[in-house]
């Protein structure tokens, strides 16, 4: 049994983490407000030209061209400018979908149409791909001569549900041939680069800002690119970069004014730019600029709380913190010690800071719902700490459920609603609190991905609370068998997520997109079993440089 004295974090063998390397750099980057104005004016001049393309009247071929244009707008990061037009086009086109797709024999066209309709909530049947299979149900080998078609089908396969068996076959077929294309090097360099990026992470699960940056580079190398669209995409991304740097400056200054850095042990993560980047993963559009700063503040708080639970808190101290959060009074600080006092003070400061904004908007329910979720989160962390220290041993299923809460799955999604105004009203918070199948699936996915990534380090640190560990013990299997089974679960969970995104009608589409974006966040953090949030080099550094430092040439 753990002693009721304060647990000493020095006794744990956790690796010391480096401090944020980016803060000084971004504070020094100048922002020219006049440049923002010039870019905005040119964007406003070009947008009507796209509107004209989207509003053109015609036959089924015209409808088909519009759907293909919508996918191009999505890939270039421009679709948010035309959401109403896109919604109307797809609703009209879906009513005559059989006429539009009936005689189409082009693999890329069908794959793109499938992706677009499903992305916007229209359940286009996967049977549209049967025209590309033989009597044995296998995809025709002649398709392998169409590199872009294979790539489009690979992308489409990631929108499959639990009953889209043909897409399972499509994924095997396309993965094999795309890897062969990479190895053979017969495609043009920009196509090979797109294939490599897509195999790392398909658009379905990638960050929208990353998709846009990569696809702009690809599209510029296409001989038949539309110069107007390319110019608009570049201007749009340049404007986003300027917005992002302004947000980072604001967030970094807020963090510096807190003056808490000297109070944290060296094991705690000063992930400042990373906390903002996690907010960018939830929404990239300029109208959510304030929301990203809010999300960054919450992400910083949640990172510190996670570190305190992993590295410092005794069960006794965390129990006292749980009681303070439930009472939610500054008076409770006096009952806490050292780090827990600073953590609770940070909680109060963040909620007070965010509260000033939402109260002025007449949306005080935001705070009530978020505080309730914070209560749930710290209680889940208490359970996890008890399990980690061997005080209690949960089942594999219980760990995945409670661990999904402790991973901040529900809190991260709910906190992203704050910067969305009336788009995410009270019903959005109530929906998350009801624990719908979609969000429970996302939470389980996050827990499994995190525990697969951290298994070796958790075990070497004596940290028992890990899904792989519990699966091995409960089902008497090896580490390798447990990991393979959990990876299979993640594949099935992704299909369930896709299914629930199509079936859920109780909340607005933008709220559903936040759920999808949380799934994307998980993929970005844990793809290839590489916890990039805790590694300042590698892929995370690449994202920061690509999105914020490398200028896009206009």
Curated annotation (Swiss-Prot):
Q: In which tissues is it expressed?
A: Predominantly expressed in roots. Expressed in the cortex and the sub-epidermal layers of roots. Also detected in leaf hydathodes and flower stigmata.
Q: Which GO terms describe its biological process?
A: diterpenoid biosynthetic process; farnesyl diphosphate metabolic process; response to wounding; sesquiterpenoid biosynthetic process
The organism's place on the tree of life at top rank: Eukaryota
Q: Where does Mg(2+) 1 bind?
A: 306, 310
Motif DDXXD motif, residue range(s) on this chain: 306-310
Induction data: By wounding.
Q: InterPro entries, from UniProt?
A: Isoprenoid_synthase_dom_sf, Terpene_cyclase_plant_C1, Terpene_synth_N, Terpene_synth_N_sf, Terpene_synthase-like, Terpene_synthase_metal-bd, Terpenoid_cyclase/PrenylTrfase
One cellular component (GO) term of this entry: peroxisome
Positions annotated to bind Mg(2+) 2: 306, 310
- Free-text cofactor note: Binds 3 Mg(2+) or Mn(2+) ions per subunit.
Key words, A-Z: Cytoplasm, Lyase, Magnesium, Manganese, Metal-binding
Q: Which comment does the entry carry about domains? A: The Asp-Asp-Xaa-Xaa-Asp/Glu (DDXXD/E) motif is important for the catalytic activity, presumably through binding to Mg(2+).
The protein's name: (Z)-gamma-bisabolene synthase 1
Output the lineage of the source organism.
Answer: Eukaryota, Viridiplantae, Streptophyta, Embryophyta, Tracheophyta
